[in-house]
Amino acid sequence: RGRGPEAFWQSAVWLRTAFDDLRHEAHAVVAAGDIVVIHATMSGTHSGPFVTYDENARVKQAFAPTRRSFAVSHTHWYRMSGGLCIEHWANRDDLGMAEQLGWIPPTPAYLWRCRRARRAAQTAHRASSIN
């Protein structure tokens, strides 16, 4: 996790690596003072490994692609200053997404595919850290 525009961009790249047709459909936008709230639906297809990282930026886990689609509700809160976002919070339906994508309950075969995906992600992460 980082800060600033580059971190925002890297988050978008990270998500699109796992969900190549990722979409956000805004249903409501509310502004009050320095806060802007957006309620939306996020949807896409799980087409690549979804890799998560620990607090030390090491690969924590990887969900192997399922080729399944999902659509979940989420709300984003932004604190604005001088026309720029200075803080961001999000509430997402991660459980609903995991169920729709077949991550839970996992089958033994899917657990094996996730283990292989995690090893591949760790290898790629080590290689990118060397270069």
Question: Which ranges hold each PLM region?
Answer:
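C-terminal and inter-domain tail/linker signature
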Residues: R1-N131
